[in-house]
């Protein structure tokens, strides 16, 4: 998938799920399931409930996403 095809949105972590999955509420109110990107996993970036994150989604399935950034 080309980078231009992805949709990036801001959201808040609602809950932590097993296997580094998270339930994220986007700014528009939509709730989706997201996992951590490989670079965040490699660098041991911790994500907790309530954190502001940037989520990358594909236009084909808007119920799943990838967390690519955690705001400080």
Swiss-Prot record:
InterPro entries according to UniProt: NA-bd_OB-fold, RNA-binding_domain_S1_IF1, S1_domain, TIF_IF1
Pfam family, any one: eIF-1a
SUPFAM superfamilies per record: Nucleic acid-binding proteins
Which keywords, in A-to-Z order, does the entry hold?
Answer: Cytoplasm, Initiation factor, Protein biosynthesis, RNA-binding, rRNA-binding
GO molecular function annotations of the record: ribosome binding; rRNA binding; translation initiation factor activity
Please classify the protein's predominant subcellular localization into one broad category.
cytoplasm
Question: Would you tell me the protein name for this molecule?
Answer: Translation initiation factor IF-1
- Provide the species name: Actinobacillus succinogenes (strain ATCC 55618 / DSM 22257 / CCUG 43843 / 130Z)
């Amino acid at each position: 998938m080309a980078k231009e095809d992805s949709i990036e949105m801001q959201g808040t972590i609602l809950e932590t799920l097993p296997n580094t999955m998270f339930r994220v509420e986007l700014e528009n109110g939509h709730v989706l399931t997201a996992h951590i990107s490989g670079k965040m996993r490699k660098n041991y970036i911790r994500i907790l409930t309530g954190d502001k994150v940037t989520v990358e989604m594909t236009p084909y399935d808007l119920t799943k996403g990838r967390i690519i950034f955690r705001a400080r």
